[in-house]
Amino acid sequence: RYKTLKAQRVTWEDHWQELADYFLPRKANITEKHTPGDKRHDQVFDGTATHALELLSASLNGMLTNTISPWFVLKFRNAMAADNDAANEWLESCAKIMQQVFARSNFQQEVFELYHELLCFGTSAMFISDDVQDDLRFKTLHISEIFITENDKGMVDSLTRRFHLKNKNISAMYPDAELPRAIIKDIENNPYEDAIIIHSVYPNDTPMGYDNNKNMDWVSCHVHEKTGTLLRESGFKEFPYVVPRYLKSSSNEIYGRSPAMNALPDTKMLNTMSKTTIRAAQKQIDPPLMVPDDGFILPIRTVPGGLNFYRSGTRERIEPLNIGSNNPLGLAMEDQRRKAIRENFFVDQLMT
C-alpha cells in the first residue's frame, strides 16, 4: 500500500518543495533535507509572498475558528425537535461543553498550521485523538508525511503517514509490540537515531462489530519500515483525520491545488527582479571606479577620509563608472508583481 501511494505522489513533491521555498520556508524539507535550526530563507529576496500567505492564514483562523467567540452551533435535523425548548437547551449545553473541550486542547495552535499548509500546498491533514484525560488532541501533519486515497464519492477515505521516531521511544509508544532483535539492538546502541514508522488508516472491508479494537470500521496499522515489523494493529470507529483540499483541478487528481500555486510564477519573477534591482542599486550607491593606468600610487583607498596620492601635473582623476541603470522602472515592475501576488491571496479584500 505504501509503495503504491508513494509512486502516485512523487510528481507532486518537486512542486511542493518549490512552493515551500518561496511561501513557507520553515516547511521546505520535502525533497531537500535540512538540519534543525538552519536558515531556510536563502532563496527569498522579497517577503511579499510569505506575508500574503500569513495574512490569509490568520484571516481564515479569525473568521472560521475564532479564539474569543463561539465558532460553531448545533442544530437538530428534525424540525419537530427544533421547536422543543427543552431539547434546544440540552443542545446548547452540549455546544458549550464542546467549546470548553476545544479550548482546553491544542486545537488553535494546530488549526493555524493547517491553514498554512492548505494555502501553500493545497492539501493538509490533521489527526484527532484523545489523551489519558479524555481531552481531544490535534496534530497537523507535514505534507511530506502523508499519502492519501479517496473513494468513489471523492472523499478521502485512507491516509498513510510516514514519520520519524527516536529509537528510545519505540518501546514507550508500542509497549505491547513484540520487538525483534534488530529493533532492540538499535534501541540499545543508537537510542537517539530516528526509526521510520509507517502508520496506515483505511476502511475495514469486513467489520465485525465493536467487541475489540481490531474489528472497527477503520483499520489502523503501525509498521517499522526497516524490519517490516507490525508494531500495532487496532482500529477506529470513525476516520481520525481531517483532510481539507483547497481546490481540485480534475477528477483524476487526489491532492489539492492552492492559491500559492497560482502565485508561484509571479513570486519567482519578483524574486529575480528584486535580486537584479538590489545589484543595480548597489552599483549606483557604490559604483565601480575607473582608475587611470598611470599617475596614481597604489593602493587606491575608497574608505571615508582615505588619502590617495597622484603625480602632480596630471589631469587624470578617479571617476565612477556610469552604468545607466533605471531603478524606477525596476521598482515599478516589482510593484506589478507584488499586486498580482496579493490578489491571489485576497489581500486587498482582507485589508478593507
Question: Where are the language model's segments positioned?
Answer:
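Extended, helix-rich architectural segments
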Residues: R1-E193
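Extended, charged amphipathic alpha-helical segments
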Residues: D217-T352
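Secondary-structure transition/turn motif
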Residues: L141-E145, T160-L165, Y202, H222-G228, ...
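Extended, non-transmembrane interaction/recognition domains
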Residues: Y202, D211-N215
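Flexible loop/turn segments at secondary-structure boundaries
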Residues: Q133-L136, D205-G209, G228-L230, M351-T352
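A generic structural signal for short, solvent-exposed coil/turn residues
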Residues: L118, F138-T140, N189-N190, N213, ...
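Membrane-proximal cytosolic interface modules of multi-pass membrane proteins
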Residues: D194-H199, P203-N204
